[in-house]
C-alpha cells in the first residue's frame, strides 16, 4: 500500500466511523410518528434486521363515518428519520380491532408477529375514550419476508382444553425464546399483572404463572437473566429475573422529558427496547415508546393525540433524548 493510498484509506475510514457514530445525533425530534385530533400512534414493537428498523404499532383512526377503528400497521427505516409509507396489516373491524403488536421473532423459516384484539363495537368519536371489551385475546401472524402477512391465528395460551370464551381478557403479548432451553418459547401478556405461558410449537401452550407488573411488557435476554420492561400508570419501569419466579425492580421510573413535552404530558407508556450497543452506528439500547397528551387517557387523549417517541441509553439507567 502506497503512502497516498494509506492516507486516503485513513481519511475515508475515519469519515465512515464518524458517520456511523452520529446516527442518533442526527435526529432532530424525539417524535417518530406524531398523532393529532383524529389519529393515534401507540404500542410500538421493534425489530432490527439487516440494518433496517421494522416498526410495528397500533394505528387508531377517527374515520369519515365518525367511528373509531384500530389497526396494526408497520413502517421501516434505515436511519430513524426517513420512514416508509405506513402499511396497515389488519382488517377494518370494530369487533376485532387488531392492535398492540408485541414483537416479531424468527421461528423455523418464518417470522411471527404477536398482537391482540381489542374489540370496541359501535365506538364513535363522541364516546372517547372507550376501552376494549372482555373479549380481547392474543393472536399471531406469520410472514416469510416481513412484508406479506398471514391472517391472524388465536393463541390458546391457557392450553387447548380451555375454550376461547373461558380464557379471560388478555392483551399486550410478547414472545421470547428461553435463555436456557432452545426451542422453548414464552408468551408474556397482561392478565393478573403479567402472565406467562410457554410452548414448543406455537400451538400447544402451558400456563406458567403470573407476577405483579404494569402493561405493555417487553423482555430482553442478557447475561443469564431476563430484563422485563413494563408500564405502570405513567412512565416505564424495569424488573429483572433469572427464573421468572423471583423479580427485582431495577432503576427508577423512566419519564424522560415528559414535563416539557405537551405531546406526552398525559402519559408515557409502552416502552420497548433493542440492544444495539455492539452496533457502531448506535452503541446504545434504543427504546421506542408512546406518549399521549396534553390530556390524560381518561380525559380523552387515548385514541387521539398519541405519538411514538424514541430515547436511548448505555445502561438502561441513564437515558438520553432530544429536547
Residue spans of the language-model regions?
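Bacterial Sec-dependent N-terminal signal peptides
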Residues: 1-21
Amino acid at each position: 500500500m502506497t503512502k497516498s493510498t494509506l492516507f486516503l484509506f485513513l481519511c475515508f475510514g475515519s469519515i465512515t466511523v464518524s458517520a456511523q457514530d452520529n446516527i442518533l445525533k442526527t435526529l432532530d425530534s424525539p417524535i417518530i410518528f406524531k398523532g393529532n385530533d383524529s389519529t393515534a400512534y401507540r404500542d410500538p414493537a421493534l425489530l432490527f434486521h439487516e440494518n433496517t428498523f421494522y416498526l410495528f404499532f397500533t394505528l387508531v383512526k377517527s374515520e369519515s363515518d365518525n367511528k373509531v377503528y384500530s389497526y396494526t400497521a408497520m413502517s421501516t427505516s434505515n436511519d430513524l428519520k426517513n420512514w416508509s409509507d405506513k402499511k396497515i396489516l389488519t382488517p377494518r373491524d370494530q369487533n376485532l380491532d387488531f392492535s398492540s403488536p408485541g414483537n416479531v421473532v424468527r421461528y423455523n423459516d418464518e417470522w411471527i408477529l404477536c398482537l391482540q384484539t381489542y374489540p370496541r363495537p359501535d365506538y364513535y368519536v363522541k364516546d372517547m375514550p372507550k376501552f376494549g371489551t372482555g373479549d380481547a385475546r392474543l393472536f399471531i401472524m406469520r410472514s416469510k419476508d416481513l412484508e406479506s402477512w398471514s391472517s391472524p391465528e388465536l393463541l390458546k395460551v391457557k392450553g387447548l382444553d380451555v375454550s376461547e370464551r373461558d380464557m379471560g381478557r388478555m392483551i399486550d403479548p410478547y414472545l421470547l425464546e428461553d435463555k436456557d432451553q432452545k426451542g422453548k418459547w414464552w408468551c408474556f401478556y397482561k392478565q393478573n399483572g403479567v402472565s406467562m405461558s410457554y410452548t414448543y410449537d406455537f400451538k400447544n401452550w402451558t400456563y406458567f404463572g403470573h407476577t405483579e407488573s404494569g402493561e405493555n411488557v417487553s423482555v430482553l435476554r442478557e447475561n443469564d437473566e431476563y430484563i422485563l420492561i413494563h408500564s405502570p400508570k405513567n412512565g416505564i419501569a424495569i424488573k429483572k429475573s433469572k427464573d421468572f419466579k423471583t423479580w427485582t425492580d431495577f432503576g427508577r421510573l423512566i419519564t424522560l422529558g415528559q414535563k416539557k413535552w405537551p405531546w406526552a404530558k398525559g402519559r408515557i407508556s409502552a416502552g420497548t427496547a433493542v440492544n444495539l450497543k455492539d452496533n457502531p452506528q448506535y452503541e446504545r439500547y434504543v427504546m421506542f415508546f408512546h406518549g399521549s397528551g396534553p390530556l390524560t387517557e381518561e380525559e380523552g387523549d387515548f385514541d387521539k393525540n398519541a405519538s411514538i417517541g424514541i430515547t436511548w441509553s448505555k445502561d438502561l439507567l441513564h437515558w438520553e433524548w432530544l429536547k
